[in-house]
Amino acid sequence: MSATKLTRREQRAQAQHFIDTLEGSAFPNSKRIYITGTHPGVRVPMREIQLSPTLIGGSKEQPQYEENEAIPVYDTSGPYGDPQIAINVQQGLAKLRQPWIDARGDTEELTVRSSDYTKARLADDGLDELRFSGVLTPKRAKAGHRVTQLHYARKGIITPEMEFIAIRENMGRERIRSEVLRHQHPGMSFGARLPENITAEFVRDEVAAGRAIIPANINHPESEPMIIGRNFLVKVNANIGNSAVTSSIEEEVEKLVWSTRWGADTVMDLSTGRYIHETREWILRNSPVPIGTVPIYQALEKVNGIAEDLTWEVFRDTLLEQAEQGVDYFTIHAGVLLRYVPMTAKRLTGIVSRGGSIMAKWCLSHHQENFLYQHFREICEICAAYDVSLSLGDGLRPGSIQDANDEAQFAELHTLGELTKIAWEYDVQVMIEGPGHVPMQMIRRNMTEELEHCHEAPFYTLGPLTTDIAPGYDHFTSGIGAAMIGWFGCAMLCYVTPKEHLGLPNKEDVKQGLITYKIAAHAADLAKGHPGAQIRDNAMSKARFEFRWEDQFNLALDPFTARAYHDETLSQESGKVAHFCSMCGPKFCSMKISQEVRDYAAAQTIEVGMADMSENFRARGGEIYLRKEEA
């Protein structure tokens, strides 16, 4: 918890200073590397952690060292992780994918925006001070064309995005030569198909089958391609967004950059306050990762927060507005059907999803079927024209342990499976959202039900939280469930911060949530047996056994916290080379004792070997030279 609570003015000033002074930067003793592909412009960024050599012998005056290989790791920070790139938030990021989009020849620039709301915002001079200056001219598919990665995959095309992803998912492990580092335990994948080497062809085939998605709106060319699917690395989403009572554009951009630095694979902008449109433009133009939204939130703002006043026309206009800004995936609560709402009446906590409750209220007040369900094909037509992926929302997810795995939850899930098939008719990419609050023994059923009824479309879950008794620590309660469901096959985990159920997260809360979920995702990758997942663990264990403290800090998910905890008790520079830590001290360090045992055993082996040779020499009569047949 922060020691001093800042005022709103101080928070905004701090965020503005962060933006004004933002520079590309690497983690301690890391450097940015790029691995090139065959398609023009495919340069895949990774972070390479530099390690110190291991002392293997020699004398104090002339020590002998053995080099340790640098460890390449997946990097979501985009240009913000490259010290060589000049960052200017006012101008936005470079449009990495623009040449690839243009080369396909199936899009056209729009001379007029499709959304009436966008037109009104652009015409409002009073918003000039808030507006992002370099507004993108949006594109859409030419008439008769679909521009989704699923469409290309089904046609057998390997796009530059697919090659980029294949290189990225392999995490540079082909650069690692050490057998010690490459050693990996077999995983238990629960039916997932994890190849030894991820190729662009494999990426294409998984997308074509609907088992994976590449969220990549043609109007978000700044994003670096990534993939969500159970046969790939488990991904983590971070939520940001302003509300009616707190946060500003500056703070949301700061949270975006902060999120990508700490490992967010995607970011959802859940803004519900003022200037949603302008905030989103700033976020998209500065985001190297896909951005998702829940369009019903903004649609509700347009009708002054009155759910009953929502209409398909308002919602459709919102979809067009956001698609032309560059939103990469929409959460759509189209599975909350009128007949399912009564199923929640006996729940302890009712309907806890904001989107789900909005649609349930609309259905009941009009006594009509959910207009998102009724107009789902039109939603798909819009998504196909911009390559917006659909994240089919779990509006009836359980909000408490008692309500887990109930009739309403699974009824909605089955409907999401039906909608998945409809979306695929339009070549629209789909993932399925999941719970929620589920005790550990009931988690796996969620994965098996999703795979069966949603046709192996990627699963994307909020946790799940495994107990309800720990407000303030729900990043832990949910991290447990997240690791489990990630192992069972969940493709992306939506982070939970310490502020869950309590308030809007700040910058530090975002970091805590992300670190917790990166741990959960990595633990799931290890358990699944994702190729190369264990390399970093092996490097850490080797550094730990050899008391290479600096390397231990730098290999950590959070080097700064690891160093700070160590230095609380051993702050002197000598503590960075000591063969012990403050937990056990020099006389009781198990690893130091293990090293001594290993050295002793090696010496004993030599002595025993020499004794055996001596006895053998005497048994042969002590002759220096033996006849050939005796040798």
Swiss-Prot record:
Gene Ontology cellular component terms for the protein in this record: cytosol
Binding site for [4Fe-4S] cluster: 581, 584, 589
Catalytic activity: 5-amino-1-(5-phospho-beta-D-ribosyl)imidazole + S-adenosyl-L-methionine = 4-amino-2-methyl-5-(phosphooxymethyl)pyrimidine + CO + 5'-deoxyadenosine + formate + L-methionine + 3 H(+)
Annotated binding of substrate, by residue: 239, 268, 297, 333, 353-355, 394-397, 433, 460
E.C. designation(s): 4.1.99.17
Entry annotated with the keyword NADP: no
Cofactor: binding comment: Binds 1 [4Fe-4S] cluster per subunit. The cluster is coordinated with 3 cysteines and an exchangeable S-adenosyl-L-methionine.
Pfam families per record: ThiC-associated (PF13667), ThiC_Rad_SAM (PF01964)
GO terms of biological process kind: thiamine biosynthetic process; thiamine diphosphate biosynthetic process
Associated pathway: Cofactor biosynthesis; thiamine diphosphate biosynthesis
GO molecular function: 4 iron, 4 sulfur cluster binding; carbon-carbon lyase activity; zinc ion binding
Record note on quaternary structure: Homodimer.
Described purpose of this protein according to its UniProt entry: Catalyzes the synthesis of the hydroxymethylpyrimidine phosphate (HMP-P) moiety of thiamine from aminoimidazole ribotide (AIR) in a radical S-adenosyl-L-methionine (SAM)-dependent reaction.
Family: Belongs to the ThiC family.
Name this protein carries in UniProt: Phosphomethylpyrimidine synthase
Record organism: Escherichia coli O81 (strain ED1a)
